[in-house]
UniProtKB/Swiss-Prot annotation:
Subunit architecture: Part of the 50S ribosomal subunit.
GO MF term set: rRNA binding; structural constituent of ribosome; tRNA binding
Organism in which the protein naturally occurs: Ehrlichia ruminantium (strain Welgevonden)
Job description of the protein: Binds 23S rRNA and is also seen to make contacts with the A and possibly P site tRNAs.
Keywords associated with the record: Repeat, Ribonucleoprotein, Ribosomal protein, RNA-binding, rRNA-binding, tRNA-binding
UniProt protein name: Large ribosomal subunit protein uL16
Highest taxon, organism lineage: Bacteria
Family, per entry: Belongs to the universal ribosomal protein uL16 family.
Keyword RNA-binding listed: yes
Gene Ontology terms: biological process: translation
Length: 136
């Protein structure tokens, strides 16, 4: 799955997701894309699930680019453990997504097939997204 090989720090602060995307808001590789409309956190499992649904719909036709990567660790303490005694262990990896960020790109397929694939993947993600195109 999508986790970094090495990080500078083992654990991160929770932080807030404010403002719009400062980069990665235009199509760079493909002709069609999926753009986020609201802020949120995507887990590596959600990104992988969306990627699988896209590749199943396309059936070896065209090319897919994943424009997000899960850099941020999320820690969690086990159940029935009292407060204190340090921060919990890493539970999952997430990527913080701002409004306007391109999540996936596709090229080499028809408009209808691209729309279908990206709408199926959109159902797997916790943020609202919209289909965008170079051609439109």
């Amino acid at each position: 799955m999508f986790i970094p090989k090495k990080t500078k720090y083992k654990k991160d602060f929770k932080g807030r997701i404010s403002g719009n995307a400062k980069g990665g808001y235009t199509l760079a590789f493909g002709t069609y894309g999926l753009k986020s409309l609201e802020p949120g956190r995507l887990t590596s499992k959600q990104v992988e699930s969306a990627r699988r649904s896209i590749s199943r719909t396309l059936k070896r036709v065209g090319k897919v680019w994943i424009r997000v990567f899960c850099h941020t660790p999320v820690s969690k303490k086990p159940m029935d453990v009292r407060m204190g005694k340090g921060k919990g262990s890493i539970e999952m990896w997430v990527c913080k997504v701002k409004p306007g960020k391109i999540l996936f790109e596709i090229s080499g397929v028809s408009l209808n097939l691209a729309k279908e694939a990206l709408q199926k993947s959109q159902a797997k993600l916790p943020v609202k997204c919209k289909f965008i195109s170079d051609e439109l």
